């Protein structure tokens, strides 16, 4: 049984041209694709609690990460 497969590296520029099937995770429980957006409320609640605590402990210098991650 051969467990190692040869694969080709894809450049980021080429990868960005692929359309469809992409879901963006914004890191706070919000997810969006081309058709809809939805919220994972347990992830959102955890993010809010974590960021609130870290903001309190660091005097406002931590938490509230924003920005999409594809």
Swiss-Prot record:
It is found in: Secreted. Its main location: secreted. The keyword Nucleotide-binding does not apply. Residues 1-21 form the signal peptide. GO terms for biological process: defense response to bacterium; killing of cells of another organism. One of its GO terms (cellular component) is extracellular region. Keywords: Antibiotic, Antimicrobial, Bacteriocin, Disulfide bond, Secreted, Signal. InterPro entries: Bacteriocin_IIa (IPR002633), Bacteriocin_IIa_CS (IPR023384), Bacteriocin_IIa_dom_sf (IPR023388). The disulfide bond is essential for the activity. It holds the Pfam family Bacteriocin_II. Disulfide bonds join 32-37. Belongs to the bacteriocin class IIA/YGNGV family. Heat-stable antibiotic with bacteriolytic activity against Listeria spp., E.hirae, E.faecalis ATCC 19433, S.bovis 83, S.uberis 42 and L.lactis. This is Bacteriocin ubericin-A. It comes from Streptococcus uberis.
